[in-house]
Amino acid sequence: MIRTMLQGKLHRVKVTQADLHYEGSCAIDQDFLDASGILENEAIDIWNVTNGKRFSTYAIAAERGSRIISVNGAAAHCAEVGDIVIIASFVTMSDEEARTWSPKVAYFEGDNEMKRTAKAIPVQVA
């Protein structure tokens, strides 16, 4: 059996640019890519917390330390500057591998200040 698992996630980053006329993609600060394990040109899903839209694109690197999250091309219709989004990538693996797999998650606040990283998502309590 093959399972699709969360590989990396940027939780609640703020969109800093939306460029309709730039060639597709989502430019992400290289520090953020490193923290989440997302690679340049990797397929990503973006879930817009602000407006509820969900879309897919691919990641490209933005300047390290810039805190840039730039939604580009047609995807710019799905996000505006200031929107809060979650960016995730997924990986496929065997059932055996999935049972011990840990994603790389980075949590953000304010103007894309990385507050912490984790290897798991906390259990949701009642």
Swiss-Prot record:
<dbReference type="GO" id="GO:0004068">
    <property type="term" value="F:aspartate 1-decarboxylase activity"/>
</dbReference>
<comment type="pathway">
    <text>Cofactor biosynthesis; (R)-pantothenate biosynthesis; beta-alanine from L-aspartate: step 1/1.</text>
</comment>
<keyword id="KW-0963">Cytoplasm</keyword>
<feature type="binding site">
    <location>
        <position position="57"/>
    </location>
    <ligand>
        <name>substrate</name>
    </ligand>
</feature>
<dbReference type="GO" id="GO:0006523">
    <property type="term" value="P:alanine biosynthetic process"/>
</dbReference>
<feature type="modified residue" description="Pyruvic acid (Ser)">
    <location>
        <position position="25"/>
    </location>
</feature>
<dbReference type="GO" id="GO:0005829">
    <property type="term" value="C:cytosol"/>
</dbReference>
<dbReference type="GO" id="GO:0015940">
    <property type="term" value="P:pantothenate biosynthetic process"/>
</dbReference>
<keyword id="KW-0210">Decarboxylase</keyword>
<keyword id="KW-0670">Pyruvate</keyword>
<protein>
    <recommendedName>
        <fullName>Aspartate 1-decarboxylase</fullName>
        <ecNumber>4.1.1.11</ecNumber>
    </recommendedName>
</protein>
<dbReference type="InterPro" id="IPR003190">
    <property type="entry name" value="Asp_decarbox"/>
</dbReference>
<keyword id="KW-0456">Lyase</keyword>
<feature type="active site" description="Proton donor">
    <location>
        <position position="58"/>
    </location>
</feature>
<dbReference type="Pfam" id="PF02261">
    <property type="entry name" value="Asp_decarbox"/>
</dbReference>
<dbReference type="InterPro" id="IPR009010">
    <property type="entry name" value="Asp_de-COase-like_dom_sf"/>
</dbReference>
<keyword id="KW-0704">Schiff base</keyword>
<feature type="binding site">
    <location>
        <begin position="73"/>
        <end position="75"/>
    </location>
    <ligand>
        <name>substrate</name>
    </ligand>
</feature>
<comment type="function">
    <text>Catalyzes the pyruvoyl-dependent decarboxylation of aspartate to produce beta-alanine.</text>
</comment>
<keyword id="KW-0566">Pantothenate biosynthesis</keyword>
<comment type="similarity">
    <text>Belongs to the PanD family.</text>
</comment>
<keyword id="KW-0865">Zymogen</keyword>
<feature type="active site" description="Schiff-base intermediate with substrate; via pyruvic acid">
    <location>
        <position position="25"/>
    </location>
</feature>
<comment type="subunit">
    <text>Heterooctamer of four alpha and four beta subunits.</text>
</comment>
<keyword id="KW-0068">Autocatalytic cleavage</keyword>
